[in-house]
Amino acid sequence: MRLEDYWGIGPKTSELLTAELGVERAVEAIESADVRALVDAGLHRGRATRILRRANGEAGMGVLATGDTREVYDDLLTLAAGYALTEHAADRIRVLTPSLDRDAIEARLEEVVAARDAWRSLDDDARERVVGAFTAYDEAGGTDRAAVETAIALREVGLTGGTFDALSGLDDDALREAADALGNVRGSLGDDDVEVAPGADDELDRLRERLAAAEELADSAFDVLETVRDGSLRDFEALEAATVDHVATETGVDPATVRAAAPDDALDAADFVSATLRGLVDELSAAVDDREATVAADLRDRIGDAGGDVDRAVEVVSDVAVDLSLGRFAAEYDLVRPRLVEDGLAVRNARSPFVDDPVQPVSYAVGTHSLAGDAGVSNAESPPTGDRVSVLTGANSGGKTTLLETLCAVTLLASMGLPVPAEEAEVGSFDRIVFHRRHASFNAGVLESTLRSVVPPLVEEGRTLMLVDEFEAITEPGRAADLLNGLVDLTVDRGALGVYVTHLAEDLSPLPETARIDGIFAEGLTNDLELRVDYQPRFGTVGKSTPEFIVSRLVANATDRSVRGGFEHLAAAVGEEAVQRTLSDARWTPEDDRSADD
């Protein structure tokens, strides 16, 4: 396969990879999602990641139907990569893509859930040992020896189940013996150009020292000529002899070896000195290569039967690093395995992975699901089943956009074979996820670009999930309601699923039978005058923005008399009694204003 056949690789990139890696090695790096190899070859890490995502998951990338969906996808992988135990594991996590292969999704879920449970089973000391082992592995550059030592450390911790079962088949004694031999090489003994480390063989060390000395002299041949040239030298033969003696003394090489490297037909003294040094460098380079090959062969013989264990350790440690990294991520966020279904999206007590502060979990669903009948789910938290579309309404700062983002995150995580942030979830298979955040701009260009981004994916063949936020933000309210009605009807007609956020529920025409309206309600103010919201949507009910709570807070916090008077005027407009009820502990009268001013 040609390098330019891969997405994102043009002539210049192909030329770079060919020069640095060779075509065969470059193709291998792309097919194995080896970000490190591409970065070492000169590609920016972000670009290498994008190339590998397309190369290894082209079909799945089509699930990311909008820029906002792609942003959530990127944020999820960045979040997960933050728990990676090695740099290579982080790279492999970053190139995960949604999959349309149900068996592949189930297989990865099995591995990650097993890794999550394995990580949870470790005490703090064992976790520190695991992290320390992988840190040492990374610092050593992921060598074969580092992999062997990491495998031994993981076996001592006692990781079992799933991917870790491969560790149980390794021979500790054989690995320890192999580790000693592997300590004498840089890289892998399986490489054709293996480099034997200094200290592994005395003869090889001596040859390398002599080669280094000869190369240094060759770089300063003119200085050598000036050193050996002496007024007492009577002829050219004397200069040749002086050159051989000087080079032999400076390099530690036998004079006969230096003489053998000297030319027989030098044109002059300068030519003789430079040619002698070049020839000696060539001779010593060949000697170093021969000796290094001999030592490497001896080291391979020392490993002997343990070679298979070494190969397995290298492979297993890399896989375990990825699985356990994802397991750490799943454990940290208390992620659970979703049930994969054909159609529908339902979550019980779901949480946004992007919100740091503890928040109220919510239950929600569109499509057909079975969570409504589960034990432990209250009626208020039992989403109706069978509706194709929900229109979500309610309070400002009520978490509507966060709910859309959470549903998007749950669906994307499940599509990548990763557990999700909920107590329970059922996730269908979607060919496209259309997540569209609210945009503040109000002009025809934004409306047109928005419609271009959400309508084409909706009318394509296959299953589509629509998660669209506040259409009224991009056009006048009356027309926005008409557009939203059209989108809801189109979603139902196309057999898609959708959640649409709006403040225009009362302006909508009657919805299709398989669409419903849900609402989020503000319930008052806290003692600190913060808005108190019940983030759990109430199904089949239009939510309330309750502006009196916002006005109440503004009245209570106003310190300027005239500004406060303005807010009081608004309070009368929205209902003074309602505002006063929310400020039962506040007495906002002109006398209070004068006291505050004093």
Can you annotate each of these PLM segments?
Residues 215, 219-236, 240, 285, ...:
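Coiled-coil heptad-register positions
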Residues 308-359:
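Charged, amphipathic alpha-helical linker segments immediately N-terminal to NTP-binding catalytic cores
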Residues 175-193, 226-282:
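Extended, EK/Q-rich alpha-helical coiled-coil segments that serve as long dimerization/scaffolding arms
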Residues 236, 247, 313-316, 543:
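Hydrophobic (often cysteine-bearing) scaffold residues that line and stabilize catalytic clefts
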Residues 346-598:
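ATPase nucleotide-binding head domains, primarily ABC-like/P-loop NTPase cores
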Residues 251-322:
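Extended, charged coiled-coil "arm/hinge" scaffolds of SMC/Rad50-like chromosome-maintenance ATPases
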Residues 1-227:
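Conserved amphipathic alpha-helical "coupling/scaffold" segments
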Residues 205-219, 282, 286, 311, ...:
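Generic structural signal for well-ordered, non-transmembrane alpha-helical segments
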